[in-house]
């Protein structure tokens, strides 16, 4: 017997419903808490969604946030946020900061004068400073991007539910929908709680999470459908447990490979896409959890058609066949 | 039993080889890029090549594929602008141009409608008061005779102007159908002009696209800053030559009918009163090049086309000793006095400009004027170093992720894990091959998409392997187990990947720039990973099985 790494024992018999008040309760609590946090803290929208300018600065001298702020004070730019950026991929002489300026009142278009003034003021503080990236988004576009993002998430949810409904049953579609909303809400809650920058790429990350989470859920559903045909007399709850147990090894393995690859990117991929990668990584964990603990609970509550082998019109014949 | 038809084997291997061949140039990115640039330059020069170009061209054999993955702005560095065309501006000039015609038409009927007068109105609307309110119907029908049908598919059947009357006031404006048609034309023209201007500067692979009804997206790799790009495309560059009526220092003084007061470029307190109708416009230029004036100062030399030259010659010979103004974007650049008739059809613009300015003005005049002003809604500049840092970080992260996944797969599934890893490597190659072949753009989130694919690509294999393990437990022999494993895993693989593809499709529609790049790599990754995970691993597995004929297998 050659050595095999087994993340999950060959045969498991875990009762996934045993603690369902705890697990589903926790999910419900986290989802509700996320809504509360979203309302209390709000999301830390990037310029994609609220307009404004971000300037990335890089210098051989260490970043002095106070001095930067003082230099920008006389320009009267309103809300200015300056943060130093740290990253393991930076060299020793690489000191990076991010300056964010909110959209200027009454200016629909982006004003290059503002950017030039900011750059000049910062150069005064630190002559070696350079500006590797400058991005400005006008309030008009940012308003539209918010709507596009909302539509995209809604359209994805609708399209996936519809597909699941076609391929399975409406109860499965509801289960998938609930677990997807759960994933999106909690991920957004984490973004609101830690005030991580939320921009267009975060939306892309959210959609990716949807894709991954549904992928996981579908594998469980597929096995469930198969087992429902195989074990016609077994209570639904047990068929579900059996299906999750049978696919558990695959679920853990796939999440494992995906997480390993993503963690490599999270650590080594640089700070520019860290928020994006963080959202996906977090979402994969929560998505895996929800496909095991959320989606099928909903299906269990809604109940499901038990006889998959025949058309409903065959009921009479089925009765005869099943008769002793 | 386990079997793959010979033609399927050839097809699978052929597709892999083809994909990898298309991907290969990306391993020698710099060299192939130099080769491609040299080939394009030599072709543009009509076959003649400098020694450097010849060397660059020889750096990559011509018979090999030479398509590369385009790097997005966030990886290559460059400028991105989103501009909105102020289409309503054109309505005003259309109505202003119509006024003399309408005035003429109404003047012909002076006997019945009495005297007429143009009154204050919002931009793009013409209001005319007539003396005899009871004759307003006659005035309306007279103006309506000037209407022409709208020249567009959607607006067919409607006329270009709308005439209405209230009391003694006549209101004329463009009809909605004509406005739509005009908007469309204005944006098309602007797009064309922007493209010509960017091409004149000769940067590599600019992207200039129309977005929505009235926006233009401009992406130029390798340009230093968005400001530089804006200076080039944000200027309207409307050049006219107008007769000078008077000069003065009061911009508020009354200009008189048909005249305008415009400021001087150099002296802000100096104003010219000009006739509004130009003698010649920039549209009649055939060429403009930077040069120097008699004092050695930077200037732009221009040449008129024959009809422009004729008009200019006629005007100058009739007005020797009079000044005329060269007007650029509503500012008087200079107002020389005509010393003698200029019949050669060429001239010079001099004034306050440096050599860069002269160069830029020449480019702008050659490319033509924008029909309407552009407003910039979004602008992004990414420095090339930042892009290179991102590429390096992405490369290291992908490698580490790849090795970790391979390690985990081999540790978990042994020899079968090796098969899956080989398929994974081929999958990576295929992603790059497809990206190169379809000329897609790789962005930073796109790299994340590839890393995500590395992790998720093995999913189909994991599903199959887990199934084979289960089937082995029921002990029906290894060949049967492998076959059943594939059969039973198929529906899960298909459903799981189609749902992900749906998401990728929506992402593509939502996306601008980087997000779109992510959607593209994700979609390609899904398709190639299903192909490699199902067919390539199966081929490897079956080939191994046929050679060894193992009695038992261990997954």
At which residue positions do the language-model features occur?
Chain A
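A structural signal for conserved, well-ordered secondary-structure elements
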Residues: 1-324
